[in-house]
Amino acid sequence: MRVVHVASEVFPFSRSGGLGDVLAALPAEQARLGANVTVVSPWYATLSGTPQEVWRGEVPGLGPVGVGELRASGVRFLFVSLPAFERPGLYHPDDVERFCAFGRAVLPVLQALGAVPDVLHGHDWQAGLVVAHAHLAGWRTAFTIHNLQYQGRWNLAEARTWTGLPDWTFSPEGVEFYGDLNLMKAGLVFAEQVTTVSPTYAREITTPQYGEGLEGVLIRLALEGRLSGILNGLDQDRWNPRTDPDIRPYADPAGKAANGSVLRAEFGLDDAPILGVVSRLANQKGIDLLIEALPELVERWNVVVLGGGDPLLTAALHGWAYHPRVAFVSGLNEALAHRIYAGADAFAMPSRFEPCGLSQMIALRYGTLPIVRETGGLVDTVPGDVGFRFADATTEALATACRDARTTLEDVVEWQSRMKRGMELDFSWEGSARHYLALYRHLCSVN
């Protein structure tokens, strides 16, 4: 089985969030299971690693295009070099135009390298145009929604010349969306099978509350049997409390306490239990609810927050950092994230929506009990007899769940029993990888 994944980022070469993590772990597991796997991504100026150039040529409508290659974990990584990506950083305001160029380059590159796959699998809107071109070329295609909120939209009158698509595709049945080009919709419409990253999120996005305006398309896909949810896994080598070099390793609840002491010492916290948060700072993640709940939370918890994003939320958290029970570090810090997962007692994820989420799985693996809103992948991964769940996206609902967790924490036997059950849950990528490979085999068996 020859599989090509296409995505805008892949850890450790380029990463801004969970998408990059998925594109590191899923292809590696598929390769371990015997598939021939290639990942195609842009060759960013700030790429970590030095690919070896394996091809350079002209692509109609784009001009010179180069391709670099790296290999790791049994996977071939191809990086497409285009002028639009020769600048610092991953994402920019003109990304629709940039990823249209990328989308037009991928098929000619794969053809030139003799790497035409059995199935091309695109991820999120940045790969939507690739899926459209692959489908029109007669290739088997799958497409995964990682976050429906981001759709890659631009005024169609300006953007249509960027795509290389035939005129008939610029319609409401195709890639047009209220006068815009919509690259997420391109992936949905032209993929033979569409997946998203948890079963609950697959159901949620067929409703107006979560469908981001595309629920009509998604309802049709569901009725046609073309929409499903496959839960993401967790890289259990990278996130392993037994071997993690950034913490004091431990294998059971009893060994966790030393990491709490380290975290308290690092931030000058008292002996109150620690509520951890590692998150992008956005209203989607419910960080505004967390901030509104802080006056009550600090009565019974130390609160340690790591994350970057929305300037207003960042400023609000900086305003709380004076409090002796609040610690806030702005930005990304991988080692500190590991210390928070290991040192906190509980972990808050009050997301308004969460397609899958990785943080709650990491927290469970580290014996840190999640306090989560019942949405998306949080429903599918946090059992009610392990973590603490609440239904409404309100400050009061979050505060109530945190009160319940704090009360339960007083029962040492119950708390450690929950920790043990959480640490024993299996979030390995093997099950997810097998589900995707079965989906590919189904695609290849259909005439």
From Swiss-Prot:
Reaction(s) catalysed (UniProt annotation): [(1->4)-alpha-D-glucosyl](n) + ADP-alpha-D-glucose = [(1->4)-alpha-D-glucosyl](n+1) + ADP + H(+)
Gene Ontology MF annotations: alpha-1,4-glucan glucosyltransferase (ADP-glucose donor) activity; alpha-1,4-glucan glucosyltransferase (UDP-glucose donor) activity
Pfam assignment, any one: Glyco_transf_5
Residues reported in the UniProt entry to bind ADP-alpha-D-glucose: 15
Domain of life: Bacteria
Catalytic EC class: transferase
UniProt xrefs under InterPro entries: GS/SS, Starch_synth_cat_dom
EC number per UniProt: 2.4.1.21
Pathway this chain belongs to: Glycan biosynthesis; glycogen biosynthesis
Alphabetical UniProt keywords: Glycogen biosynthesis, Glycosyltransferase, Transferase
A single BP term in Gene Ontology: glycogen biosynthetic process
Family statement drawn from the similarity comment of this UniProt entry: Belongs to the glycosyltransferase 1 family. Bacterial/plant glycogen synthase subfamily.
PANTHER family noted in UniProt: ALPHA AMYLASE DOMAIN-CONTAINING PROTEIN, GRANULE-BOUND STARCH SYNTHASE 1, CHLOROPLASTIC/AMYLOPLASTIC
Job description of the protein: Synthesizes alpha-1,4-glucan chains using ADP-glucose.
Protein name according to UniProt: Glycogen synthase
Underlying gene: glgA
